[in-house]
Amino acid sequence: MLFNVLLRYFWRNYSTIENAAELQLRQDHVVTLESRPPNIEGKGEITIRDLVINALRMRPDRIIVGECRGGEALDMLQAMNTGHEGSMTTLHANSTREGLSRLETMVLMAGMELPHRAIREQIAAAIDLIIHLERLRDGSRRVVAITEVQGMEGDVVTTADIFKFEQVGFENGKVIGRLRPTGIRPKFIDRIEQAGIHLPASVFGVGERLRNY
Protein backbone atom coordinates (compact mmCIF):
# COMPACT_ATOMS: atom_id res chain seq x y z
CA MET A 1 0.00 0.00 0.00
CA LEU A 2 1.42 3.37 -1.04
CA PHE A 3 0.34 4.99 2.23
CA ASN A 4 2.46 2.57 4.25
CA VAL A 5 5.52 3.41 2.16
CA LEU A 6 5.01 7.16 2.52
CA LEU A 7 4.37 6.93 6.26
CA ARG A 8 7.80 5.38 6.80
CA TYR A 9 9.26 8.81 6.15
CA PHE A 10 7.07 10.54 8.72
CA TRP A 11 8.54 11.20 12.12
CA ARG A 12 5.89 11.29 14.82
CA ASN A 13 2.95 13.16 16.30
CA TYR A 14 0.33 12.47 13.69
CA SER A 15 -3.14 10.97 13.74
CA THR A 16 -4.50 8.34 11.37
CA ILE A 17 -8.21 7.94 10.71
CA GLU A 18 -9.62 4.83 9.02
CA ASN A 19 -12.77 2.78 8.70
CA ALA A 20 -10.70 -0.27 9.63
CA ALA A 21 -7.08 -0.11 10.78
CA GLU A 22 -4.87 -1.17 7.86
CA LEU A 23 -1.90 1.18 8.09
CA GLN A 24 1.30 -0.29 9.54
CA LEU A 25 2.62 2.31 11.96
CA ARG A 26 5.94 2.05 13.79
CA GLN A 27 6.62 5.63 14.85
CA ASP A 28 6.22 7.05 18.34
CA HIS A 29 3.37 9.33 19.38
CA VAL A 30 0.92 8.21 16.70
CA VAL A 31 -2.81 8.19 17.45
CA THR A 32 -4.91 5.73 15.45
CA LEU A 33 -8.65 6.32 15.23
CA GLU A 34 -11.32 4.05 13.70
CA SER A 35 -14.88 4.83 12.72
CA ARG A 36 -17.73 2.80 14.18
CA PRO A 37 -21.09 1.88 12.61
CA PRO A 38 -24.32 2.39 14.56
CA ASN A 39 -25.68 -0.42 16.70
CA ILE A 40 -28.93 -2.24 15.99
CA GLU A 41 -30.81 0.67 17.58
CA GLY A 42 -29.17 3.12 15.21
CA LYS A 43 -27.07 4.70 17.96
CA GLY A 44 -23.38 5.00 18.75
CA GLU A 45 -22.13 5.73 15.24
CA ILE A 46 -18.76 7.45 14.98
CA THR A 47 -18.10 8.78 11.48
CA ILE A 48 -14.86 9.66 9.76
CA ARG A 49 -15.92 13.28 9.97
CA ASP A 50 -16.38 13.01 13.75
CA LEU A 51 -12.87 11.60 14.02
CA VAL A 52 -11.29 14.33 11.87
CA ILE A 53 -12.85 17.01 14.06
CA ASN A 54 -11.70 15.28 17.25
CA ALA A 55 -8.22 14.60 15.87
CA LEU A 56 -7.75 18.34 15.36
CA ARG A 57 -8.29 18.86 19.08
CA MET A 58 -5.29 16.62 19.77
CA ARG A 59 -3.05 19.09 17.93
CA PRO A 60 -1.19 16.61 15.70
CA ASP A 61 1.40 17.80 13.21
CA ARG A 62 -0.33 15.85 10.44
CA ILE A 63 -3.63 14.08 9.87
CA ILE A 64 -3.86 10.97 7.71
CA VAL A 65 -7.34 9.95 6.54
CA GLY A 66 -7.43 6.49 4.99
CA GLU A 67 -10.14 7.47 2.50
CA CYS A 68 -12.36 10.50 2.05
CA ARG A 69 -15.88 9.60 0.95
CA GLY A 70 -18.05 12.51 2.05
CA GLY A 71 -18.28 15.67 4.10
CA GLU A 72 -15.09 14.94 6.02
CA ALA A 73 -13.28 16.28 2.95
CA LEU A 74 -14.16 19.81 4.08
CA ASP A 75 -12.64 19.27 7.53
CA MET A 76 -9.59 17.69 5.93
CA LEU A 77 -9.04 20.70 3.68
CA GLN A 78 -9.46 23.09 6.59
CA ALA A 79 -6.90 21.11 8.58
CA MET A 80 -4.44 21.27 5.69
CA ASN A 81 -4.95 25.02 5.48
CA THR A 82 -4.42 25.64 9.20
CA GLY A 83 -0.91 24.39 9.85
CA HIS A 84 -1.21 20.62 9.36
CA GLU A 85 1.18 20.43 6.41
CA GLY A 86 2.03 16.97 5.18
CA SER A 87 -1.48 15.65 5.78
CA MET A 88 -2.71 13.02 3.32
CA THR A 89 -5.83 11.20 2.23
CA THR A 90 -7.06 9.02 -0.63
CA LEU A 91 -10.13 8.99 -2.86
CA HIS A 92 -11.32 7.10 -5.91
CA ALA A 93 -11.27 8.80 -9.32
CA ASN A 94 -10.27 8.01 -12.89
CA SER A 95 -7.63 10.74 -13.15
CA THR A 96 -6.01 13.50 -11.13
CA ARG A 97 -8.31 16.05 -12.75
CA GLU A 98 -11.41 14.01 -11.92
CA GLY A 99 -10.05 13.59 -8.40
CA LEU A 100 -10.26 17.34 -7.87
CA SER A 101 -13.85 17.39 -9.13
CA ARG A 102 -14.79 14.53 -6.83
CA LEU A 103 -13.15 16.28 -3.89
CA GLU A 104 -15.23 19.36 -4.61
CA THR A 105 -18.38 17.22 -4.66
CA MET A 106 -17.49 15.65 -1.32
CA VAL A 107 -16.97 19.07 0.28
CA LEU A 108 -20.52 19.97 -0.76
CA MET A 109 -21.72 16.82 1.03
CA ALA A 110 -20.74 18.49 4.33
CA GLY A 111 -23.95 20.52 4.04
CA MET A 112 -22.26 23.92 4.01
CA GLU A 113 -23.53 26.28 1.33
CA LEU A 114 -20.13 27.26 0.01
CA PRO A 115 -19.61 28.85 -3.43
CA HIS A 116 -17.77 26.59 -5.87
CA ARG A 117 -15.00 29.14 -6.22
CA ALA A 118 -14.44 29.21 -2.45
CA ILE A 119 -14.14 25.42 -2.40
CA ARG A 120 -11.67 25.45 -5.28
CA GLU A 121 -9.60 28.12 -3.56
CA GLN A 122 -9.39 25.91 -0.47
CA ILE A 123 -8.37 22.93 -2.61
CA ALA A 124 -5.71 24.95 -4.44
CA ALA A 125 -4.30 26.29 -1.17
CA ALA A 126 -4.37 22.97 0.70
CA ILE A 127 -3.08 20.41 -1.81
CA ASP A 128 0.42 20.35 -3.25
CA LEU A 129 0.59 16.97 -4.92
CA ILE A 130 -1.72 14.26 -6.27
CA ILE A 131 -0.48 10.72 -6.89
CA HIS A 132 -2.69 8.70 -9.22
CA LEU A 133 -2.56 4.90 -9.07
CA GLU A 134 -4.25 2.81 -11.72
CA ARG A 135 -4.86 -0.87 -12.34
CA LEU A 136 -3.29 -1.67 -15.70
CA ARG A 137 -4.52 -4.31 -18.14
CA ASP A 138 -2.12 -6.91 -16.71
CA GLY A 139 -3.76 -6.48 -13.30
CA SER A 140 -0.84 -4.64 -11.72
CA ARG A 141 -1.27 -1.37 -9.86
CA ARG A 142 1.14 1.35 -10.90
CA VAL A 143 1.65 5.01 -10.23
CA VAL A 144 0.64 6.54 -13.57
CA ALA A 145 0.81 10.24 -12.72
CA ILE A 146 2.29 12.58 -10.12
CA THR A 147 0.60 15.94 -10.51
CA GLU A 148 1.22 19.29 -8.85
CA VAL A 149 -1.66 21.56 -7.89
CA GLN A 150 -0.30 24.95 -8.91
CA GLY A 151 -3.03 27.40 -7.93
CA MET A 152 -6.01 29.12 -9.52
CA GLU A 153 -6.62 30.73 -12.89
CA GLY A 154 -9.99 32.41 -12.84
CA ASP A 155 -12.39 29.86 -11.36
CA VAL A 156 -10.28 26.84 -12.31
CA VAL A 157 -7.75 24.92 -10.21
CA THR A 158 -4.60 24.62 -12.31
CA THR A 159 -2.44 21.50 -12.33
CA ALA A 160 0.72 20.26 -14.02
CA ASP A 161 1.90 16.66 -14.46
CA ILE A 162 5.39 16.30 -13.00
CA PHE A 163 5.71 12.59 -13.84
CA LYS A 164 3.67 10.42 -16.22
CA PHE A 165 3.71 6.69 -16.80
CA GLU A 166 4.91 5.78 -20.29
CA GLN A 167 4.06 2.32 -21.58
CA VAL A 168 6.59 1.01 -24.08
CA GLY A 169 5.35 -2.53 -24.57
CA PHE A 170 3.35 -5.54 -23.45
CA GLU A 171 5.27 -8.79 -23.09
CA ASN A 172 4.31 -12.14 -21.59
CA GLY A 173 1.11 -10.66 -20.23
CA LYS A 174 2.89 -7.79 -18.48
CA VAL A 175 2.82 -4.06 -19.14
CA ILE A 176 6.32 -2.70 -19.77
CA GLY A 177 6.92 0.95 -18.95
CA ARG A 178 8.13 3.44 -16.41
CA LEU A 179 7.34 6.75 -14.79
CA ARG A 180 9.02 9.54 -16.74
CA PRO A 181 9.52 13.20 -15.84
CA THR A 182 7.67 15.72 -17.98
CA GLY A 183 10.34 18.41 -17.79
CA ILE A 184 8.33 20.61 -15.41
CA ARG A 185 10.01 21.76 -12.20
CA PRO A 186 7.37 21.84 -9.42
CA LYS A 187 6.67 25.16 -7.78
CA PHE A 188 6.93 23.70 -4.29
CA ILE A 189 10.54 22.58 -4.79
CA ASP A 190 11.81 25.61 -2.85
CA ARG A 191 9.95 24.42 0.25
CA ILE A 192 11.51 20.98 -0.15
CA GLU A 193 14.97 22.51 -0.35
CA GLN A 194 14.29 24.61 2.75
CA ALA A 195 13.73 21.30 4.56
CA GLY A 196 17.24 20.22 3.57
CA ILE A 197 16.30 17.98 0.64
CA HIS A 198 18.11 18.98 -2.55
CA LEU A 199 16.97 17.46 -5.84
CA PRO A 200 18.87 18.13 -9.07
CA ALA A 201 16.91 19.53 -11.99
CA SER A 202 17.59 16.31 -13.90
CA VAL A 203 15.19 14.45 -11.57
CA PHE A 204 12.37 16.38 -13.22
CA GLY A 205 13.84 16.00 -16.70
CA VAL A 206 14.42 19.74 -17.04
CA GLY A 207 17.80 19.40 -18.75
CA GLU A 208 16.52 16.50 -20.84
CA ARG A 209 13.59 18.58 -22.02
CA LEU A 210 15.92 21.34 -23.19
CA ARG A 211 18.12 18.86 -25.06
CA ASN A 212 15.08 17.40 -26.79
CA TYR A 213 14.36 20.81 -28.26
Would you name each region that the model predicts?
Residues 139-213:
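NTP-binding/hydrolysis catalytic cores, primarily Walker-type P-loop NTPases
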Residues 1-2:
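Hydrophobic positions on the alpha1 helix immediately C-terminal to the Walker A/P-loop
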Residues 5-126, 132-134:
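Switch/coupling sub-region of P-loop NTPases
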